[in-house]
Amino acid sequence: MIFVGANSSPAFVRLHKIVTDQNMWAVEDASPYILHYIYNSILNKREKVMTYKEIRKNKEIKAFIKRAGINLTSLGFTDHSEVHTTLVADRAAAILKEFGYDEHTIELAKIAGYMHDIGNAVNRTHHAEYGAILANDILKGTDMPLEDRVTVVSCIGNHDESTGGATDPVSAAVIIGDKTDVRRNRVSNKDKSSFDIHDRVNYAVTEASLKINADKKVISLNLQIDESICTMYDYFDIFLQRMIMCRGAAGVLGAKFKLTANGSKVL
């Protein structure tokens, strides 16, 4: 190869290799000046990988998550605060890690899981679609590569059971992480006498555990339900569609989804 230096004269030199995690350049060598120029050119062209840690520090994202939680609490829904979004992110990461996915895919699942409910800051109805639009707008202002942004946006737009479904490993893990977050302390209403069916169903769950068995390719949600608070019929009236969605998501990961309630296999 021929490189032109600052004085515009060709420089011919020995073979050198400059290696980065994305590129390998073979040059018929050059002065330190030329090598330095090439190396910096490579670094400047590389797209920065946005991390989950950086996303969690983003003030705009945190503001939307906070508003989403406030909106749904005021409307009488269960907890959708940062506690929920963090749990979904952690659970999605654990699923993909157990199934052997690479760190980058896991990182995208954590980001999408953390951001998945921001659309509730606009409105509960169509919150997945609103969230996808918001996420795309916010992430455009970061250093996240386009392909990664599209993956996150698609996941958010497809996470709701009424309109979406798993389309790739990231969305599959986030869907399972989201739909299996069933716990008593998600109930924001403290007045038991005014519980609606959603409150009763969540409050009735005294114990919930998600188990991931990559060897057997099985993801299991095991629940203990206080039937004096909520009947099994009530539970499945509310959650059956979500559990079926989890089954489809597990299929995308090449696994099966199983549900047990009070020791009995249900799904």
Predicted segment positions?
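Extreme N-terminal basic, low-complexity initiation segments
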Residues: M1-P10
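Short, Lys/Arg-enriched N-terminal segments with co-localized hydrophobic residues
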Residues: P32-V49
